[in-house]
Amino acid sequence: ILAGLEKPDDGLVQVQSNTRIAYVAQEPQLDAASSVFDAVAEGLQRVRYLIDEYSQGHGDLDAMQSEIESLDGWNWEQRVTETLQRLHLNPEAIVSTLSGGTKKRVALAQALVAQPDVLLLDEPTNHLDLDSIEWLEGLLVDFTGSIITITHDRSFLDNVATRIVELDRGKLLSYPGNFAAYLLQKEEQ
């Protein structure tokens, strides 16, 4: 629901305006024929569309310019390049030739290049080897936005979580700390 893939059965989803949300699926859907650069640039689809419309003189140019600037869009190619370098990805590689773990990195880069306020991760350690998981943990610890993740990887949760939220039989309960702290708090209940 937060990623916009499903509609709630009832109620209202409210997100503060200008909040950027990025979602990394458990099994990333990337264009197999794309280069890694192009696949990551898909994370800036809105920016690229606005720049194209602006360049062609379509629509309200002042409003488009303001939105492009608010999205830090004029330097989108540089952002893609910097993100690829940070994640140690070859921009010229073709997606179909990549391992599952590298495809996951491409999907993460696609999300991160958009500079999201909220990063949604569905089983982020799937397809990753131990070195890649440690790399991901470091990346997430340094992430300045909010992260919501669904995972069965308890070690990963211990290393990155600052709060565990449990949904059980329609009740939402929040526990400060990592997974180990959550287990202690549950035991005390």
Model-derived regions, located:
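ABC ATP-binding cassette signature C-motif
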Residues: 1-189
